[in-house]
Curated annotation (Swiss-Prot):
Record bears the keyword Nucleus: no
Name of the protein in question: Dihydroxy-acid dehydratase
Lineage: Bacteria, Pseudomonadati, Thermodesulfobacteriota, Desulfuromonadia, Geobacterales
Organism: Geobacter sp. (strain M21)
Active site: residue positions: 467
Gene: ilvD
Function: Functions in the biosynthesis of branched-chain amino acids. Catalyzes the dehydration of (2R,3R)-2,3-dihydroxy-3-methylpentanoate (2,3-dihydroxy-3-methylvalerate) into 2-oxo-3-methylpentanoate (2-oxo-3-methylvalerate) and of (2R)-2,3-dihydroxy-3-methylbutanoate (2,3-dihydroxyisovalerate) into 2-oxo-3-methylbutanoate (2-oxoisovalerate), the penultimate precursor to L-isoleucine and L-valine, respectively.
Amino acid sequence: MRSDTITQGLERTPHRALLKGTGLPQSEMGKPFIGIATSFTDLIPGHVGMRDLERFIEKGVHTGGGYSFFFGIPGVCDGISMGHKGMHYSLPTRELIADMVESVAEAHRLDGLVLLTNCDKITPGMLMAAARLDIPCIVVTAGPMMSGRGDAGRKYSFVTDTFEAMARYKAGVIDDAELARCEENACPGMGSCQGLFTANTMAILTETLGMSLPRCGTALAVSALKRRIAFASGERIVDLVRQNITPRSIMTREAFENAIRVDLALGGSSNTVLHLLAIAHEAGVELPLETFDILAKETPQLASMNPAGEHFMEDLDVAGGVAGVLKQLGDKIHDCPTLMGLSTKEIAASLKGVDEEVIHPLSNPVKKEGGIAVLFGNICPKGAVVKQSGVSDQMMKFTGTARCFDSEDKAMAAMMGGVVKGGDVVVIRYEGPKGGPGMREMLAPTAALMGLGLGDSVALITDGRFSGGTRGPCIGHIAPEAAAGGPIAFIEDGDTIELDIPARSLKVMVSDEVLAERRARWVAPEPKIKKGWLARYAKVVTSAHTGAITTAE
């Protein structure tokens, strides 16, 4: 075992002494050393319930014959960090998390890891670490929050009843009392936000990849089932160490294709494109951006999930969960191994039935194509991403007039001030991985568009990204980004922009010669942040089309 490096032999006397200083008995010294990487914090609802899950994981490890050690990993809530300086830090924490897990596991020669996670960037960061280390690992996602409840059985959801509610209030659609009800009811307790936002999408994809146990991706945070899954995961990691089953044997090209198909079938968050590309990079799997679009054209959307649809995570869980989606996709799914020991098709076959009002059959899809589309054109020669499952039919093709902003803050002020009108295309740039830095989510502007009633008359394009809670004609991940000299930097107010999602096209209607002339006189702006972690991050991060990974160069 890897831990023999610190427990065996005369030369390791000091190491054993230090371990015994933690209370480790001599009788446990030869057991598999299991690290439990916990992202517990009582600052955010998605992670506040993890103390209980830690206990169950620990019990499982010891029942399985291992010895566990806890170590902490930071967790950032995208909702709390949204709309201010804090959002610059969200995506970069993904890299910090991967590096921290790698550092602790390698420094202490741990034999295996249980990765306890939940919110947006923590789960992909943990998976990146697992793929990079390639030692036995299993992921436990802490689970989704229940929907909020109000008068007459009304259901509340965090994004639609807070961010969008602000704009509805500003427009006079709701009053003080209703706004207060939204605030009180939107987040009723522990768990990740209730709809198919980034955290829940990543939990589902983790299960689909085979890196967490069945039902882990959808079981509610408050459920007894989640605690049983935590226990079973702790027990299972010891078996994985003994059998030397490692993440790269699970996260194959075929497994990534399965994850993409499930993502497309559910209409998941566009952030998953960034994260799957980054995880695949760490796993040594070639996964071009175009793969998402190729699979989208042959994978129909089978569910209508909040925020763009009617169903919540609690509905998806009882309808069949991930296994139900796999079952409905049938032969479109590869038969891949999972950490459970069963293959994907065996897991799907074990499910007796599926609630087809929630997870439709292939013969009766919600939409003919999957939820994510990849666009190209003279604005985005290396690609852009749109969550087409959240776009109304009338906005799938749109031509409008550019209204350009060099930051999210300026765009938000213009929207709330009534400057943006129907027929505009809002261009938000210098918000990419380098330019932001940190590729902030544009949830506040997109929620403002919907709340102001402009979702069917205004499009938004950006080199930033969007929340999993975003809906409407919002195109993100434009690459190359403005700070890297991408063409989005050369768009001017008044330009005509043509969006054609069915044709996978996004263009500014000016000639190549005009764009070349604008490029020649373009001067890169000074970095927004010149010291600290974000300044270092901006120097080594790539554009969105490669997953916004960091490089050694």
